[in-house]
C-alpha cells in the first residue's frame, strides 16, 4: 500500500502549485498510508530524476470524464461547464509544468520558485484560455487538443529564459557549497548541481524544444486515434472511475488537493520523449496507440524492453484478429454451403413428391400394395414423432415467451459447470481441478484454492445479469472468436469485502453461445486492484482474449432463468438504484457476515 501512496505523492508534487506545502501533502498521505514524513522523503529522494512528461488531453470531474480530446466547448454538458472553465484556466500552468518541471529534493524550493517566476512574468496569448476555447476556428470548433497544443507552442518562448536562469542559479549554488563538509559530500552536491546546469542549458536548444513539441503532438494525435475506438474509450472511462473510487478509499479526495489528485495526477505521465518519438517513427500509430493507452492505464516504467513487449503484443493481437477473420469467413462459407445443400435437397424432394403425386392419380383408390402401406405407416409414425418433438419445443418456447412477456427485458443465461464448481468446499474443488484438464489449476494448495474461492464463488451475480437493468451495471466488450466459438466479456466495477480485507476491482464475466445459441457463463470472478494496478486490471478485463483454450459446450450447464440457491447457502441480495449487493452469511450464525460484494452502476461519460 505504501508504494501506491508514494506513487500518488510523487505525481502530486509534480502537479501541485508551489504554494501547496509539502508538509500538507505528507500529512494527508500519512493518514492514508501510515508512513512517517522522513520515510516519504527518503522514497522521494530515491525516485527523483530528470524525467520528462507528457500531458493527456482530457478533463475529469469526480468519477467521470467530462471533456474528451476531440470535444469542443459547445459539446460539453451545461452542468459541467463551470468546472471545465476552472480547469481550462489552470491548463497553461499545467502545460508549462509538464514541459520543464524537475524535482530535486535538496533544491526543490528555488527551482519551483524560478519556474513560477518565469511563467508569471511572461506574456501569453492564452491568459484568456476559456475565451479562446469558446471561439470557433473557421467552420470547425476548436477542440481540446487544438487548445492545448497552442499552449505548448506558446510556452516554447519561455523555455530558453527558464533554462538560462536554471543554469546560472546552479553555478551560484556550486560556489556556495560550504568547505566544512567532507570532500565526498561536496562532490555529490556538485554533481547534482552540474546536472541541473546542463539540463538548464539543454532547455534553450532548438533540438530539445522540438523534441518536447513532437512528443506532445504524438500523444494528442494518438489520443484522437484511440478515441475513435469504443473499446479504448471504455478503458479510459473505467480507469478514471476506478481511480476516483480508490482516492476516496484512501482518503485522498478530501481537502484542497482533491481536484489535483483526480484531475492533474491522471493527466501528467512520465515517459522518455526520445523513446516515444522513436517508437512512433519505427512502428507507426498502432504500436504507439497501445503504448500511450498503457501509459494512461498503468504505472509503468517504459523503457526499450517494454516497447519491445508492446510490439510483440500488437503483432499477436493482429495475428489473432486475422485468425478470427478466417474462422468467421470459414463459418459463413459453411453456412452458405449448408443452405445450398438444404435447398438442393428441398428441390429434389419436391420433384419426388410431384412425381409420386402424378403416379397416385393413375391408381385406383385402395389399390396400394402391402409394402407401400407399411412404408406409409412408418413415414406417418416418423412424422408424428417429429411433430411431437416440434410441439414440445413450441410449448417450451411459448412458456419462455410467456415468462419474457411477464418479465420484459430479462436475459437468459446458463452457468457452466466449471463456474458452479467454486460453490463447493475447497477440498472438493482441489480434487476436481487436479484431475481436470486445465493445467493452471492443477497442484494448487488448499490455501490457494480457498483464496481463489473468495474471488470466484460469486454466482449470485447471475441474478443481476438476467435482470432488466443489467446494462446499467455491466459494460460489454466486443465479440471475438476462439477455437471456432464466439465469445465475449461483460465487466462491472465492484467492491469485495471479507472479514480480513476490503478491495476495489472489477467483476469479469466470460460468455459464449452453445450449440443451441444459448448464452453460457464459463468464467466469473472478482478481480481486485489497487492504485497502481487499476489500469492493468481494466486492460485485462476488456481484452478480447481469455485463457480458456477449449470450452466444452456439450457439458451440462445450469439454466439460471429460474435458478434458486440451496437452503444452506446463506446469502441475500440487496438492490439499489446505483448498486447491487450480495451478502454471504455464516449458516450457523446469520448475524455474522462472511463476505459482501457490491456492484456499482457503470460510470457516466461513456
Curated annotation (Swiss-Prot):
Ranges for region Disordered: 317-401
InterPro entries cross-referenced by the UniProt entry: DUF3654, UPF0329
Alphabetical list of Pfam families matching this protein: DUF1609, DUF3654
Bias (Basic and acidic residues): 328-353, 381-401
Bias kind Basic residues: ranges: 354-367
Family as reported in the entry's similarity comment: Belongs to the UPF0329 family.
Protein name: UPF0329 protein ECU06_0090
